[in-house]
Amino acid sequence: MLVRILGCSGGIGGNLRTTSMLVDQDILIDAGTGVGDLSLTELQLIDHVFLTHSHLDHVAMLPFLVDTVGGMRTSPIVVHATAETLAILKDHIFNWKIWPDFSKIPDEKNPMMRFSELKLGEPVVLGGRRFTALPANH
């Protein structure tokens, strides 16, 4: 497993990028502004996005990621997050006011993005890699 740090700051400017890590080529942990430094080819390879929480410095580039490559893919980008974080994304970002709801585009059977609820302590296994959400106070 190769982990590439795309950003680890709470702000932007100069060399600062907000939190995001690329695992191998296909898994993103958080979607901070460092995602914007990836090439179009690298963006297209991302199949899964794990969100640690809903703060803007961790989710800012998710709408742009899906908007940029969603129509170029044959399968949806899967967004993994707790029920609380998913509800915040649906209510405040992918709500047709701030950004389109890509879980319904082009239709609900074939979306560009799919939400998957993470439960604390329950692992998600992807290609032999295990990801487990743990509680944090932030």
Regions picked out by a protein language model, each given a short descriptive name:
Residues 84-137:
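Metallo-beta-lactamase
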Residues 34-84:
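Active-site metal-binding motif and surrounding structural segment of the metallo-beta-lactamase
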Residues 18-20, 76, 119-123:
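Short, acidic/polar N-cap/turn motifs at the starts of alpha helices
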